[in-house]
Amino acid sequence: VLAFDYKFNSQWVLGAEIEFEAGGTGSAYEIENTENGEYEMEVEKGGEVALEQFHITRLIHPAFNVRAGHLIVPVGLTNEHHEPINFFGTSRPEGETTILPSTWHENGIEVFGTFGRGYTRFNYQALVVAGLNANGFDRNTWVAGGKQGLFETDNFTSPGYVARLNYLGVPGLKIGGSFYYCHNTGANSDKPETYVKYGNIPLRIYTADLQYKNKYVTARANMIYGNLSKADDLSSVNNHQSGGSPYTQTTPIAKRAVSYGGEV
């Protein structure tokens, strides 16, 4: 993994995180509409190189800045802090990474900043990103398989709206919450016509988390609650997906998902 920031000047910063893997992570699927909509895997996307982050930031004011590109989606505790030094186990927290994409990164635009001082200090992020793809939802991993990136292009038909707020007023303490909303996950499907008769299929995710660190102790806790509308209708469609697609056919898909955990 190669991660870096390049500062053009005091206002413009380029950030990137690039992965080099021998497994050909840059392969992608495409749909051959001239062959009855068959799925085919292609390697033109990049072979062994994959981008986890690649964005340009315009620094305007401590309380308001703008970033655009391929961004980490700050929903939950682990996505923002997915490096191994940020959890005690040998793998990422299972509850969070089972029901949400991890690491979750999408194309989009973000505004962020810090405001307040002393005991009233906060930071925030607000993003519009490519929404989750309903084709990838299933029984075992809920919406984790809906992250964009399987295909050569991402679908931005129904974007995801993300907001996060962190309280930073006490040294060593961080209390945060985030919200995700996509109005119609079915519209982001690679075959959206299969969901049209069910109308909009909205998804809402709420999270709360806490971290405390000093030289003697480190403690973390988080909770996630998600609600997927029309889960029964979605299950009936996903249960009949093509066997050649990159998706599973494991249904039924849960209407609600909950995860919580902590470590000290």
Language model region names:
Residues 37-42, 93-97, 147-151, 192-196, ...:
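Extracellular loop and loop/strand-boundary signature of outer-membrane beta-barrel proteins
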Residues 45, 154, 199:
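Charged, low-complexity surface patches
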Residues 134-188:
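Loop-centered beta-sheet repeat module
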Residues 21-25, 75, 93-94, 131-135, ...:
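Sequence/structural signature of outer-membrane beta-barrel proteins
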Residues 26-33, 47-49, 80-85, 136-143, ...:
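Outer-membrane beta-barrel translocator domains and adjoining extracellular loop/strand segments
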Residues 167-264:
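Detector for outer-membrane/organellar transmembrane beta-barrel domains
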Residues 1-134, 157-162, 166-174, 255-256, ...:
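Outer membrane beta-barrel
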